[in-house]
Amino acid sequence: MISNILKKSNSLFLRSTLSSNKFTNVTILRNSLFLNNNNNDNNTNIKQTYNKINFFSTTVPNQNEKIELKQEQIKQEQQQQPEQQPEQQTNKINNEIELKIKILENSLKYVNSYGWTSEAVSKACIEMGYPPITQGILGEDSAYELALYFVTKCNTDLMIKLSDAENSEQQLLSGLSKKEKVKLALKLRLSMIKPFIGRWSEAMQLLANPKNIVNSSPSMLTLVDNIWYLVGDKSSDFDWYAKRGLLIALYTSAELFMLSDTSVDHSNTWRFVDDRVDDLIKTIKFKNDIEETVGITLNTFLQKIKK
């Protein structure tokens, strides 16, 4: 009788031990069942079984406690790890930027052989002692990044040349009219692409690609804005936008003309720039004359009405 009861209890408590969310302790029940049956062999076997259940139930944690223990372990590991100082983070970023610039600058040597392509960047990485996969640091399209780097570098170099008071170009610039200053600035900027003129159409395609145009536009806007600034233009409102839009169109057309120019030292391109700048200044002057004429006429008309 007691044996049957204990067998059923054994099964029930085993299931309880495995499914419970807390530790299960069956010691109390075990003691109460065996108080008056110490001489029974069957009871002894059952007692051993309960001892096993008691050991199992008091040594195996449930799933929730495992998760809590793991979270506590992760928290302790995070506390032990030293936090990166802002200075260390800044140095890491600066080192990464320097590496990008070195790779891109070195890649320019391979443009004439491999074009504005990822292959040119790979060759540069290999020469520097890095595997070709290192170009991934530049982004998804290393060829585009190379073209964008070059035009940005050229814009910066132009600004430095025309802003340096000790530079010979600055001395020439100071003695020129606004029209001649614009011509000189455009010619200096166009001359910077001469070393890559045979491959420049590839760069233009990359920069004008619809997926890249958003990132490419600021470089062109910076170029024309710098030129008008160096010329001394102080226009505002609509004039500011009109002049920059016209100069962008002029420079782009000059680049396209230069691609097919076979004249000595691109003399035809420089003549093209001279003619287009003359037209640009005439257009701006004509626009200003029209505005002035309309203003005078309107003012005269209003004065007559008041009388």
Swiss-Prot record:
Grouped into one coarse class, the protein's main location is mitochondrion
Region described as Disordered: spans on this chain: 72-92
Q: Give the record's keywords alphabetically.
A: Lipid-binding, Mitochondrion, Transit peptide, Ubiquinone biosynthesis
Q: List the disulfide bonds.
A: none
Record-listed a 1,2-diacylglycero-3-phosphoethanolamine binding positions: Y241, A242, K243, R244
Q: What does this protein do?
A: Membrane-associated protein that warps the membrane surface to access and bind aromatic isoprenes with high specificity, including ubiquinone (CoQ) isoprene intermediates and presents them directly to coq7, therefore facilitating the coq7-mediated hydroxylase step. Participates in the biosynthesis of coenzyme Q, also named ubiquinone, an essential lipid-soluble electron transporter for aerobic cellular respiration.
In Swiss-Prot or TrEMBL terms, this protein is called Probable ubiquinone biosynthesis protein coq9, mitochondrial
- What is the organism field in this record? Dictyostelium discoideum (Social amoeba)
